[in-house]
Amino acid sequence: MCAVAIHRSDVVMPSVLLTGGRTAKGKKRASRRRVKVPKLPKGARRKRASVTPVPTVATATASERAALTNLARRLQRGDYAAWRPADYTSPAVSEAARAAASSGTPATARDLATGTLARAVPMTGTGGRRRKRTATRRRSLKGGFLPALIPIIAAAIGAIPGIAGTAVGIANLKEQQRQFNKIYGDKK
């Protein structure tokens, strides 16, 4: 139900229901009759909790929610051992490529842990020549890159209604951003 107030220059009187008392003449008494008003059903009488809609940029699918929940649990447990990057390749592939490049002949390598077999054929040349690249010095993060991911994941979880309350998610996000900036902020 929505109530709209319209402000005008003239005064509007409210509607009045007379249930008893004197009439305009003041001599006669109004009959004491009870006016029966139909009762509202019990469900309508109960005061509903006010619902505030929270706009979301994009809602996550059930699979995305499950993945984020799983990720959050693993972060809480500290289970980082089984993590692999999205572009993960078997060690057999890199070993076969390295052997083929250095020998100049086709090479095969097998990963005994997973059973992955990789074959590599050199494109051109005899191999053996390798250029040394000067490594650019990168600033190392305290505790590796995983602590840096925690606020991002927490923000993602906080942004999805159903996993965490939105207000709680926002409060946690602000605190985590503050801690993150305190540790990794611009230091010169």
From Swiss-Prot:
GO terms for molecular function: DNA binding. Residues 24-49 have a biased composition (Basic residues). It comes from the Viruses. Its main location: virion. Signal peptide: none annotated. It is found in: Virion. The record marks 14-15, 144-145 as: Cleavage. The keyword DNA-binding applies. Residues 1-128, 145-188 form a propeptide. Residues 22-52 are annotated as: Disordered. Keywords: DNA-binding, Late protein, Virion. It holds the Pfam family Adeno_PX. GO terms for cellular component: viral nucleocapsid. Belongs to the adenoviridae pX family. The role of the precursor might be to condense the viral prochromatin for encapsidation by virtue of the two basic domains. This is Late L2 mu core protein. The gene is PX.
